[in-house]
Amino acid sequence: MATSYRTILIHPGARSFTSAGLIARFPMSMVGISTILAVEELYGSYTAAGLVSAANFVAMAIGAPILARCVDRYGQSRVMLPAVLVSSLSLVGLAVAAAVHAHLGILAALSALAGGLAGSMGSLVRARWTAMLTRPEEVHAAFSLEAALDEVAFILGPVLATALCTTPFLPVISGWVCCVVMQLVGGLWFLGQRATEPAPHPTRPRRTAEAAEQSDQAAAHPPVMRYGAMVSIAIVFLILGALFGANDVAAVAFATEAGHKSASGLVLAVWGVGSFGAALLYGSRTWGWPLWKQLMAGLVGLAVGASTFGFAPSLVVLSVLALLTGLAIAPTLTSGNNIVQVTVAPSQLTEGLAWVSTALNIGVSIGSLLAGQATDAGGSRAGYLAVAAFAWGAVVVGVLGLPALRRARTSGSLDGH
């Protein structure tokens, strides 16, 4: 296993931009919980906290694909350096505004500005890997490594944010402050590594013969969301996000009903640990199946596992089921990202990855909302019914999208079909 990852990490600059990217993606998993904890504490309202948090989320969903398109055209550092700086300053402003009990409209505006300019760091890192690596099996290993690092951020980030916001001797805005520090340290370190930055693909290059040919080739590519495979993957990721969001709510409800509310974090952490381990194993070898089969196998595995949660008699059994089901998460997401990589043109890669990442994040919000309503009405069992429904919904969408997924562009394919 170690050999596969050692092979890609020996490339000049790989370890450096991977480390920077890991730090820079922590804020994505921390801002939401930091906002809810801080605003609720300072304003005494979960509604207000939800409003400010939603502003950040909606703006991020809108802004990430736009920033990604600009990155593909003009380059990562040229676009994201000012965006990261303004996003960080907006988070500082949000912390100050909340501390002085400013009007909620000001908080929402600052939260939206911070989210809209945050970008999708995972997409930027994966784009660097794609530009650096030439062998399909190396790209597969790199994307699996990134899936594992995503899990690290999303397992540890909320725990760190909660600890900072709830520790008695620290101000409740400490979660935001930590987000700013990690965004600046990781973001500036990452964007400062110009040697590994992918070359931009301007839409109007200088009209040399070579540039004219590049322009004609770029014009031949349809918009990202006109690819059938892209639409299928985006919808699948949207539903998977809903599954993840619903699972968060259902796990908290189950642990609360069992009289151990604090154990909900352990259940969710175990779910992430399973995904982390599977990501490393999945990326350590080349799989004989085409990508669409790998995706469908992962979706079915998730659906079967998620269908068992509602029958768990105890937290211990639920944790075991979550660990086993988590094994399907990272391989499923990685195969989906790999399909994006072989579907869109190189000049559209960052945008394509940002679209599916955005779909996943939107789904989390939708799943949390719907599962929250189901849980209020029928307890954790109803919440886990929603989890299972989302899981099988993703399978159905995957099956319906198979014609497009099987026709995905095969130049540089990872699956050899």
Regions from the PLM with identified roles:
Residues 293-334:
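C-terminal transmembrane helical hairpin of 12-TM major facilitator-type secondary transporters
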Residues 347-378:
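A late C-terminal transmembrane helix in Major Facilitator Superfamily
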Residues 156-179, 366-382:
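Transmembrane alpha-helix termini and helix-breaking/packing motifs in multi-pass membrane transporters
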Residues 85-101, 301-313:
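C-terminal ends and interior cores of transmembrane alpha-helices
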Residues 119-134, 251, 331-344:
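Intracellular juxtamembrane helix-capping segments at the cytosolic ends
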Residues 2-61, 220, 224-267:
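Helix-loop boundary and gating motifs at the non-cytosolic
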Residues 112-152:
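Cytoplasmic helix-loop-helix junction between adjacent transmembrane helices
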